[in-house]
Amino acid sequence: KYIEPEPFLPSYPACIPHLYNMEVQIYRGYWMVTWFVREFANQEAKEAAIQSMAVEEVLNERLMEIPPGSQGLVLQPYWGPGLSRPEAKGAIVGFSDYHTRIHIYRAIIEGIAYGLREGLEGIEKRQHKKVKEIRVSGGGSQSDAICQITADIFGVPVSRVQTYETASLGTAILVFTSAHEFNTFEEAVESMVHISTTFVPNLEAHKQYDYLYNHVYEKMYPRLKSVYKSVRKYNRKYE
């Protein structure tokens, strides 16, 4: 059934007939990790070079030093304009003197997950179904820490398959099915897609995230919308 995840944001026809792909965007979402590395992670970049690691791996180790909820630091991940909220800007609230760079990094990861949860809840309302499990792919899915935070915020199991390059995997499924190596798409998926890891929500962490999501994150955009518009008006002279 065709359902728009948001007004004027269409669902795209899937490769399988009569099915559609619904999409919710966090524009430049995990790009914020790149931004953080560039602006704040010089120390971790040096450590990564010494250990012949990616800087993101070092940051993921540091990530777990900070408790769920980043000790009240909540980030709204609008570093770039989205389709439905073009005036929105990035915001971080809850700063105290004990917050560090790594608190900001964890707040970025949590903020992206809050934004995705908000989008998923909109889809659930429109299709009148609850999502019971999430499958993740892409660069962020390589991190166990990020996958666990995502499971804790959504409150459902998060699973990843044998490769994070799932667009290429999907293309391979289409090719093999079209070449009649498999009789159906379902048969191809059964043969070629394998769950490698599942992250189960930590109930105590989920309880903390629920509080911050409902009482802080969800209230940020409505309260800040007029401020965002003023900032956007001011910034036009720099565009």
Q: Where in the sequence are the language-model features?
A:
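Glycine/Thr-rich phosphate-binding loops that ligate phosphate moieties of nucleotide
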Residues: 1-239
